[in-house]
Amino acid sequence: MNLNKIRKFFRESHIFFRDFLNKRFPPYNVEQPIPETEEFTLINADANLASLTENVLPNFPIDVVFTWVDNTDKAWQEQYYRTLQPIDQEDIGLYATDPARFSNHNELFYSVQAVQKFMPWVRNIFIVTADQKPKWLDENIHSKIKLINHSQLIDAKYLPTFNSHVIEANLYKIPDLSEHFIYFNDDVFVARPLMPNHFFENNGLASLFVANKSFQKMRQRGLITPTLTASEHALKLLKRHYPTININTPLVHTYVPLRKTSFQKAWSLFEDEINSFLNNKVRHNSELNMASFLIPWLMYLDGYATPKREICYYFNIRSSHAQTQYKKLLFEKEHLHMPHSFCINDSSSNNADKNYALHFRNFMDTYFEIETE
């Protein structure tokens, strides 16, 4: 080792040890087995490969669907607490009534902005709501955006509902919905320009964003959420029709490419089981996770989906770790090394950073270059 290198080592020893540790113990930001150091290389490689077939067949329309609630709406609050009062708490799933599940930090505004900015090829953006309208939405300006009320999709005898599983089970009934669509929760944000073939191949094959997790390990950790049990129940139904399958894996917490005809097939196969939970006003442990488990895996088993890479940063808005992730995402944006997406989840109000909402807004305004008054 020459003298200059020795001097550099002592002058920048922190960089040396950082790089050493990163090589020895590479950091992981995502739910797939992809170390941070390889994220950008893999995103570029995938995009270059996909571009080779993007014009083989004519493009087909692709819509985006959001589900959203405004928990600050007084009428919604009154209806929610009136509906919740007679329900036996023992029947309700973990976090199902936690205020964080319905908290509104204007996520929808930022998520829609991201779709419009980074996915301009989307045909329609449907927002499914409980007869609510975002304050920022001017439909004369946002002509692609269409509001859909629960009453347009769900039988009146099941309304009102505050159960995302019930709402998701009926998404395929959206009027004028395209065969190929992408389902978003409003806590998922597109982080970079994405082409249609990130979601659907040119021949219509959907992307299946499989997570590097297992139901068994999730249960061992002890957090038995309604999403976990609803996915396990859905898996039992899939095994009834595909008895040789061995699925033990959820999907990445991000957007989900879906097909309307696969929804229709699921209803034809499992109508009784779906109808059995539609009257649950909030999430219980006896339901089906259709939009982010049953339908995507049904598509895969029928040959309509294939596993794909999805680099999505996933963290909780209320945790102290969120600020670290905000800084990392802004740094990566500055250097054009952004992930595909990020999900800033808000499922539990426990142990919250007291300034979490302010940190979130400041980050989002900066990342998406939103001018504030």
Swiss-Prot record:
Record InterPro entries: Stealth (IPR047141), Stealth_CR1 (IPR031358), Stealth_CR2 (IPR021520)
GO biological process: polysaccharide biosynthetic process
Disulphide linkage map: none
GO MF assignments: transferase activity, transferring phosphorus-containing groups
This enzyme's EC code(s): 2.7.-.-
Principal EC category: transferase
Sorted UniProt keywords: Exopolysaccharide synthesis, Transferase
Domain of life: Bacteria
Function summary: Part of a capsule gene locus. Expression was not detected under standard growth conditions.
Similarity-based family: Belongs to the stealth family.
Other comments on record: Stealth proteins are part of a protein family that is conserved from bacteria to higher eukaryotes. Family members were first identified in microbes as proteins that help pathogens to elude the host innate immune system. Microbial stealth proteins are involved in the biosynthesis of exopolysaccharides. Stealth proteins are predicted to function as hexose-1-phosphoryltransferases.
Name of this chain's protein: Capsular polysaccharide phosphotransferase
